[in-house]
A protein has these predicted regions:
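Compositionally biased, charge-rich terminal segments
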Residues: 1-8
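Nucleotide-sugar donor-binding catalytic core of glycosyltransferases
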Residues: 15-122, 130, 138-147, 170-270
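Long, hydrophobic/aromatic-enriched structural stretches that serve as scaffold segments
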Residues: 132-135, 161
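Active-site proximal beta-strand in glycosyltransferases
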Residues: 152-168
Length: 270
């Protein structure tokens, strides 16, 4: 068998195995959700839960909030998350990457613990100096330990967890009993924002308060432009999950797809 054919078969087998794992995970959470008699919270339930949880806090006008944001700018976050948050107030932003590179193979053994300590110390200093209204994070279990999130929670500032693609990554890989996704950290946040509707039950089972907000687009950036069309279909996003298999199938059906982002032959757009 040629090497190229073997690689394709291996990728397809990996996709099949992951699909089975995700299906099993989905069914297990469905069963636990039903057996515990849980319910997905609606807007009124979320408001009541936050009111009871965040005693002593009062609403502020839009634009008047003091916000601490914790996330790494992979490629889109700085141009999307930060301007969106700034509509609600001032934003102080922590990105650990320059001091703690989390892309190395030995990240968990070498610098994860140090990064987590720095995160808690830095945010603690900012909280003491500024008394922010909210801490907004785009994190995962791969990046932070559950006890790190508990330490952040102890500062007494409302915390929001933002997560994308919980269909594949709510649990994700598990190393040393800890999930790379949101499973082990979500319960320590006051509110968990997920773009994956069928992950709501997973959050409830793990003791979190979830809200479903579907992915959208920033109309200031993503809008029709009068440009010559040179590509049948374009996709912009990192290469992972079922994306390669989806694009492979489209190409096999005669739909020419050009993909851009980390991991694709075309590379990122910026």
């Amino acid at each position: 068998m040629e090497e190229g054919s073997f690689k394709r078969l291996r990728k397809r087998f990996g996709h099949w195995r992951k699909t089975k794992r995700l299906r099993r995970e989905f069914l297990e959470y469905q069963a636990r959700f039903a057996s515990q008699g849980l319910a997905i919270p609606d807007d009124s339930s979320i408001r009541l839960a936050l009111k009871n949880r965040l005693t002593g806090f009062r609403p502020k006008p839009k634009g008047a909030l003091s916000i601490i944001a914790v996330y790494h700018n992979y490629n889109w976050e700085e141009g999307a998350l930060k301007p969106a948050l700034e509509k609600f107030g001032t934003v102080r932003y922590y990105d650990w990457f320059e001091a703690f590179d989390h892309t190395g193979r030995d990240w968990r053994r070498s610098v994860k613990a140090e990064m987590n300590r720095d995160l808690v110390v830095r945010i603690g200093q900012w909280v003491a100096a500024e008394r922010p209204d909210v801490i907004f994070t785009y994190l995962s279990g791969e990046l932070v330990f559950p006890e790190t999130v508990q330490a952040l929670r102890s500062f007494g500032v409302p915390m929001i967890h933002f997560s994308l693609n919980d269909k594949e990554h709510f649990v994700g890989k598990v190393r040393g009993g800890l999930a790379f996704g949101s499973r082990d950290i979500c319960r320590w946040f006051d509110l968990c924002w997920t773009s994956t509707e069928d992950a709501l039950k997973k959050y409830c089972v793990e003791g979190a308060l979830p809200v479903y907000l579907p992915e959208g687009a920033n109309p200031e950036l993503h809008r029709p432009r009068e440009l010559e069309k040179t590509t049948d279909v374009s996709f912009v996003g990192q290469r992972y999950g079922n994306r390669p298999e989806t694009i492979r199938r489209l190409n096999a059906e005669g739909v020419r797809v050009e993909a851009f982002g980390y991991g694709w032959p075309n590379g990122p757009l910026s």
